[in-house]
From Swiss-Prot:
Skewed-composition ranges (Polar residues): 72-103, 121-142
GO cellular component, one term: cytosol
A Gene Ontology molecular function term of the record: DNA-binding transcription repressor activity, RNA polymerase II-specific
Protein name: Transcriptional repressor NF-X1
Organism this protein belongs to: Mus musculus (Mouse)
Gene (UniProt): Nfx1
Domain of life: Eukaryota
Zinc finger (NF-X1-type): 447-465, 500-519, 561-580, 626-649, 688-707, 715-734, 826-848, 857-878
Region of interest (Interaction with PABPC1 and PABC4), ranges: 9-26
Listed Pfam families: R3H, zf-NF-X1
Length: 1114
């Protein structure tokens, strides 16, 4: 049996095999309208039903498919005309769209011929098992029945995870049948029988080949009842799926017993029941090609197929081959994106995301090729040109739904597949589609096929074709869905050679490179002094036959000369020859002179490696290890063998951070380090940003902080134990495994409880013991103290002055706000503080002023309180009012200053009684001044007092009283305020103009017939408006301001009987006040003294001459 070459992820199709690209070979006899309606009904079923897989035998390559189909037609079964084909296709419109292709039609007719020939064979042969074995030996394909109803229900689902397909039967529910196994190889069905039963039940049967073209298509057909009985004998534990416990009953079906009876009467059909899983695992695997030949059908797919089959049987209107009415009656699966779009666009229920309006079937639209949302063409144009659609940092505009960036703004209304511009709407087609085949390629998939659906919205469905892929190890081939990017794995071992080149990979079939070899080997170094255990494949190709690696030690093996050992690092064999051999040494030890020149000068020739090398006698000059890059030290000895001696110079070395340098003898460099540490401290900040480095002679590039953070975490209980870091500390990782409850225990947080978690909130009433017995209104809480009680009560104030109401219970000390007025311990004063708590005076004496009246003036003492002591003698600080004789002048004077005449009175009294003092008599001066004399003290009158006195005399002379006002001075002066006068002085001309306007307005209203008359002043500033308002009050006018700044103006209104002009204008008053005043008259003191005989002693004392008290006359 010839097999097709393995194909790994690629497709091989014959250009003549049009069956795998549907719609390419159409029936030529159909017109365009008929064919379009056929495609429309076919595309609806293809969208929302399982795609029929292309089941092919594994021994037939894709290139020979067309040849198989060409020879599969039997005589008399070929369609005679296109109309006949059209009629036959109408009978099976519920099948998949691929059924209507010529190759599918020929395939169905081939099986009908096969059934007829099998019936003839069944008459000649009585043993059905023999026929079955002969059919297996004749062909490697599985005996399958492809009726129009079965082709639709074939489903093959590849493993989406890329694993090896399991050896399970492909189960689908057929009309009137139980579970049916499809797609099995003949060799696999043969494996189901044990060798013993196969020998017993199989015998050769001669089959005559009447037609060479049908030789490859002859397959025996056996009675299904006989097959079922034979299978029950071989597998007694097998039950139909509807009898399995927990199996889902088939909708719309009769009990299995009645169905089987009805199918037995219907006629013979080939039906192979599936193999149970237990038997399937026990069946041995004979070839690698049989392992992945079948796909597994999931339970969900079987359930969906059952429901779809039930829907097709119950609703015959859905299976109508031609769309009738306004809407397209195709079977749509609303669970898919495409089906939902078709339904919403057809019923005009789809909304444009830009304008939120419904998309009409006749409106131009645009569909996004990324998310497949549909928009109005005009709406998407406006959106693309708006600033909100521009992508940040990219050129183009964003889709409103998926934010996919597009470069070009759509300007043309096209169908969904993009082939037709401005498609016309037809009630028999999907709105906004062209009605032709989509033909779009699957983006991003390795699939050469194009979409064979009619022009549709939404994404194209997966490719329904199948291909053969080779597994990752290349030993088996599997049939998978075309375009799926899954990798195929088998259950065999990989067996590829590992990196070591000796062992094979023992893992199951996998992708990518194999893992390194895991076998541990013991290797020895080249010199044999060290060994190690490594993985197999380490240092492959470095072995010298004795060792496998270098230990980096001195080799130490004896050289061929026998006198020296190898001084090289451990290396592969063999060792280099002795470097001191005569034929290898050509220069003197310092390397400056060739040995040939030294031999000419009489040096002895070397014969062995042990002979010394002749010296040239020059300075050695080899560079030493000391010195610097600028000045290299050299050996100062004469040409010699061996190592150079120590250097006698000094070298400059730098500290570790290169901040300081110092000189050291070269001889001490070997014993000491070439670097030293300076005392400079690093001032850079550490990575934490909180601390400084402070390391001595620091050379770190990243200054890591070695301290522990130590900051408190959010829980408030623990501290951060991580190294000092930037930013916020992490959350506390501590957790409690005890239940966290509220105070009353009603609410619980079960462990683990993160550290810092607050107790749960509880809605129960607080159950704690409270200080008062008032009702509790607050909930259970975790705080230690309960909220204050807010129950309103009556409480006395702290000073017991009054009983206050509506006081919350938690308030203890209440002040009424009144003075305390409690008697102080001094017994003279009362507490002046507001109502307070506790004693009035705490550790202090009363400091209120003493109220005891003085003996001289009667004013209080005003000294700090002294209850047990007499009042101290101090000057009285009380203020008294003094007046002049006329009463015009009044001043407040301190009482002690008013009695300043005490000294003068004492001097006068002593002068008068000086004789008595000379005689030794005492003089009492306390009686010289009394309270009456102090109260009679007066101030001196000034010039204004004299002018007032003169006016008073003139008034008396002209008989002018205070009530009369002949010059109208009081009335004019009282009408103009001081502020108005001050404002008028700033702009006297403006005031004069305003007064003229007001006088004219008042005269006009008094003389005219109207009771009111108004005048509008032009716009002006605030100060001028204020002057107008003040003058209007003087003239009795009404003034109102209108408009807003800077056009605000004033309108004055005169009212008859109310508005009167003042007797004196403001302008004349200001001019009179600004004129120069004449000097005041000179007062006449003699006349004043005569008029005032009762003047005070103070005035007399001031006017008297100075008395010379020491001018004593005998």
């Amino acid at each position: 049996m010839a097999e097709a070459p393995p194909v790994s992820g690629t497709f091989k199709f014959n250009t003549d095999a049009a069956e795998f690209i549907p719609q390419e070979r159409k029936t030529s006899g159909l017109n365009c309208g008929t064919q379009r309606r056929l495609d429309s009904s076919r595309i609806g079923r293809r969208n929302y039903s399982s795609s029929p897989p292309c089941h092919l035998p594994r021994h037939i390559p894709y290139e020979d498919i067309s040849a198989v189909h060409q020879h599969s037609y039997a005589s008399g079964s070929k369609p005679k005309s296109p109309q006949g084909f059209f009629q036959s296709s109408n009978k099976s419109l519920k099948n998949h769209g691929l059924q209507n292709q010529p190759w599918q039609k020929a395939r169905n007719e081939k099986h009908q011929n096969r059934n007829k020939k099998a019936q003839g064979l069944s008459e000649q042969t009585s043993d059905t098992s023999s026929l079955e074995s002969v059919a297996r030996s004749e062909s490697g394909t599985n005996p399958r029945e492809h009726s129009p109803s079965e082709s639709e229900k074939e489903v093959v689902i590849a493993d989406p995870r890329g694993a090896k397909p399991k050896k399970a039967a492909q189960l689908t529910y057929n009309y009137g049948r139980g579970p049916k196994a499809k797609g099995r190889l003949r060799s696999e069905w043969g494996n189901r029988m044990s060798p013993k039963s196969e020998d017993e039940n199989t015998r050769p049967v001669a089959i005559s080949h009447t037609d060479s073209s049908d030789a490859s298509c002859r397959k025996p057909v056996v009675d299904p009842c006989v097959c079922r009985r034979n299978e029950q004998r071989r597998y007694p534990q097998k039950r139909p799926p509807w009898e399995v416990e927990g199996a889902r009953p088939r909708p719309g079906r009769n009990p299995p017993k009645q169905e089987s009876q009805r199918h037995i009467n219907a006629g013979p059909k080939t039906n192979m029941s599936p193999i149970p899983k237990d038997n399937l695992r026990e069946r041995p695997t004979k070839s690698a090609c049989d392992t992945g030949n079948l796909a597994v059908v999931s339970k969900s797919s079987r359930r969906v197929n059952q429901e779809k089959t039930a829907v097709r049987r119950q609703d015959p209107q859905v299976l109508s081959p031609f769309p009738r009415g306004k809407q397209n009656h195709m079977l749509k699966n609303v669970e898919t994106h495409t089906g939902s779009l078709i339904e919403q666009l057809t019923t005009e229920k789809y909304e444009c995301m830009v304008c939120c309006e419904l998309v009409q079937v006749t409106a131009p639209v645009w569909s996004c090729q990324s998310c497949f949302h549909v928009f109005h063409l005009n709406c998407i144009k406006k959106w693309a040109r708006s600033p909100a659609s521009h992508a940040d940092g990219q050129s183009g505009w964003r889709c409103p739904a998926c934010q996919n960036v597009s470069a070009h703004v759509p300007n043309t209304y096209t169908c969904f597949c993009g082939k037709v511009k401005n498609p016309e709407w037809s009630r028999n087609e999907i709105p906004h589609s062209c009605g032709e085949v989509c033909r779009k390629k699957q983006p991003g998939q390795d699939c050469p096929h194009s979409c064979n659906l009619l022009c549709h919205p939404g994404p194209c469905p997966p490719c329904p074709a199948f291909t053969t892929k080779t597994c990752e190890c290349g030993r088996t081939r599997h049939t998978v869905r075309c375009g799926q990017p899954v990798s195929v794995h088998c259950s065999n071992a990989c067996e590829n050679i590992l990196n070591c080149g000796q062992h094979h990979c023992a893992e199951l079939c996998h992708g990518g490179q194999c893992q390194p070899c895991r076998i541990i080997l013991n290797q020895v170094c080249y010199c044999g002094s060290t060994s190690r255990d490594v993985l197999c494949g380490t240092d492959v190709g470095k072995s010298d036959g004795f060792g496998d690696f270098s230990c980096l030690k001195i080799c130490g093996k004896d050289l061929k000369c026998g006198s020296h050992t190898c001084s090289q690092v451990c290396h592969p064999q063999p060792c280099q020859p002795c470097p001191r051999l005569p034929h290898l040494v050509r220069y003197c030890p310092c390397g400056q002179t060739p040995l040939s020149q030294l031999l000419e000068h009489g040096s002895n020739a070397r014969k062995t490696c042990m002979d010394p090398v002749p010296s040239c006698g020059k300075v050695c000059g080899k560079p030493l290890a000391c010195g610097s890059s600028d000045f290299i030290h050299t050996c100062e000895k004469l040409c010699h063998e061996g190592d150079c001696g120590p250097c006698s110079r000094t070298s400059v070395i730098s500290c570790r951070c290169s901040f300081r340098t110092k000189e050291l003898p070269c001889t001490s460099l070997k014993s000491e380090d070439a670097t030293f540490m300076c005392d400079k401290r690093c001032n850079k900040k550490r990575l934490c940003g909180r601390h400084k480095c402070n390391e001595i002679c620091c050379v770190d590039k990243e200054h890591k902080c070695p301290l522990i953070c130590g900051r408190k975490l959010r829980c408030g209980l623990h501290r951060c134990e991580e190294p000092c870091h930037r930013g916020n500390c992490q959350t506390c990782w501590q957790a409690s495994f005890d239940e966290l409850t509220c105070h009353c225990g009603a609410s619980v947080i079960y462990p683990p409880v993160p550290c810092g978690t607050r107790p749960p909130e509880c809605t129960q009433t607080c159950a704690r013991i409270h200080e008062c017995d008032h009702p509790v209104y607050h909930s259970c809480h975790s705080e230690e103290k309960c909220p204050p009680c807010t129950f309103l009560t009556q409480k006395w104030c702290m000073g017991k002055h009054e009983l206050r109401s509506n006081i919350p219970c938690h308030l203890v000390d209440i002040s009424c706000g009144l003075p305390c007025s409690a008697m102080l311990p001094c017994g003279m004063h009362k507490c002046q503080r507001l109502c307070h708590k506790g004693e009035c005076l705490v550790d202090e004496a009363c400091k209120q002023p003493c109220t005891t009246p003085r003996g001289d003036c009667g004013h209080p003492c005003m000294a700090p309180c002294h209850p047990s002591l007499p009042c101290p003698v101090t000057a009285c600080k009380a203020k008294v009012e003094l007046q002049c004789e006329c009463g015009r002048r009044k001043e407040m004077v301190i009482c002690s200053e008013a009695s300043g005449t005490y000294q003068r009175i004492v001097a006068i009294s002593m002068a008068s009684k000086i004789t008595d003092m000379q005689l030794g008599d005492s003089v009492e001066i306390s009686k010289l001044i009394t309270k009456k004399e102090v109260q009679q003290a007066r101030l001196q009158c000034d010039e204004e007092c004299a002018a007032l006195e003169r006016r008073k005399r003139l008034a008396e002379a002209f008989d002018i009283t205070d009530d009369s006002d002949p010059f109208n001075v009081r009335s004019s002066a009282s009408k103009f305020s001081d502020s108005l006068k001050d404002d008028a002085r700033k702009d006297l001309k403006f005031v004069s103009d305003v007064e003229k306007e007001m006088e004219t307005l008042v005269e006009a209203v008094n003389k005219g017939k109207n009771n009111k008359k108004s005048h509008c002043f032009p716009p002006m500033n605030r100060d001028h408006r204020r002057i107008i308002h003040d003058l209007a009050q003087v003239y009795g006018l009404e003034s109102i301001s209108y408009d807003s700044e800077p056009k605000r103006n004033v309108v004055v209104t005169a009212v008859r009987g109310k508005s009167v002009c003042p007797p004196t204008t403001l302008t004349s008053v200001i001019e009179r006040e600004t004129q120069t005043r004449p000097p005041p008259p000179i007062p006449h003191h003699r006349h004043q003294a005569d008029k005032a005989p009762g003047s005070s002693t103070l005035q007399k004392i001031v006017k008297e001459a100075v008395i010379d008290y020491f001018d004593v006359q005998d």
